[in-house]
């Protein structure tokens, strides 16, 4: 299985701390050696870093850790390959344009007997994850030829994710840069940090950060991960079928499918 990392914040925030913890699981404290990627939204633009190498040994990952890019929405992923060979084209997150915005997607899990819709969006690589992403966007494009608010889109997103979940394991993160959507099939956890901030210690490497010194009293930052990244904070675990929608660090909608 792979691992996911997402962030939604009300101010541009760097994710170096959480990213540093996740990267250790890419071959050092975890088995996810088959590539990694992370996407940072900057307005309507997107910075995407990917490498099919193990993240714990990747010079590109080292660059990202040394370069604290600030963003309000981030999606990251480390891969343990199930479907598709280890190569750059199979490395998450995947990105496509829809309605003049960059949509970004990362998936943890595996789908069986999945036949995607063949339409406008087509995979570049050969993973079931990218096929599901293209299938999802084709559904959205067919149902809504013109842009709509995410609140109008939510029922279609949730229904599609529930359908994918019925074919295997489908934990995912999805964003267009304004919002962050999360769906849990088996494993996801979240933490929202707000004032009063305190110190946090990573599980996978001996690193501590004092968020009090790094933030302002008005900052709200939510981090979503497959497994909790810190050992001294209380994370909330999702239940199977649970989904949530985040904007500016706050949960604006949530629910659960059967």
Segments (PLM) and residue ranges:
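Residue-level signal for inorganic ion chemistry
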Residues: 38, 109, 132
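A conserved acidic, glycine/proline-rich C-terminal tail/linker
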Residues: 199-242
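Short acidic (Asp/Glu) patches
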Residues: 52-64, 78-100, 117-119
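Glycine-rich phosphate-binding loop plus the immediately following alpha-helix
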Residues: 113-115, 120-143
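Extreme N-terminus nucleophile/cap motif
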Residues: 1-59, 200, 241-243, 249-258
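Gly/Ser/Thr-rich active-site loops/lids in small-molecule metabolic enzymes
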Residues: 128, 186-209
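Conserved beta-strand-loop-short alpha-helix elements that form
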Residues: 2, 103-113
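Catalytic core of PPM/PP2C metal-dependent serine/threonine phosphatase domains
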Residues: 73, 146-186
């Amino acid at each position: 299985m792979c691992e996911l990392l997402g962030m939604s914040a009300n101010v541009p925030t760097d994710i170096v701390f959480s990213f540093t913890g996740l990267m250790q699981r890419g071959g050092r404290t975890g088995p996810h050696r088959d590539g990694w990627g992370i996407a940072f939204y900057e307005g309507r633009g997107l910075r995407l870093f990917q490498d099919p190498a193990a993240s714990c040994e990747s010079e590109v990952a080292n660059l990202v850790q040394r370069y604290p890019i600030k963003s309000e929405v981030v999606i990251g992923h480390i891969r343990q390959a199930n479907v598709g060979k280890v190569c750059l084209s199979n490395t998450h997150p995947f990105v496509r344009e829809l309605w003049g915005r960059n949509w970004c997607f990362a998936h943890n899990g595996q789908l069986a007997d999945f036949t995607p819709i063949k339409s406008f969006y087509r995979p570049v690589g050969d993973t079931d994850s990218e096929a599901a992403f293209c299938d999802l966007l084709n559904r959205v494009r067919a149902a809504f030829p013109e842009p709509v608010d995410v609140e109008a889109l939510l029922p279609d997103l949730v229904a599609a994710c529930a359908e994918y979940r019925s074919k295997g394991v489908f934990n995912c993160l999805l964003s267009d840069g304004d919002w962050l959507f999360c769906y849990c099939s088996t494993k996801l956890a979240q933490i929202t940090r707000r004032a009063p901030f305190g110190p946090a210690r990573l599980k996978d490497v001996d690193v501590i950060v004092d968020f009090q010194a790094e933030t302002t009293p008005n900052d709200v930052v939510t981090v979503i991960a497959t497994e909790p990244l810190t050992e001294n904070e209380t994370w909330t675990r999702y239940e199977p079928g649970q989904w949530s929608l985040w904007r500016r660090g706050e949960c604006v909608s949530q629910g659960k499918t059967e």
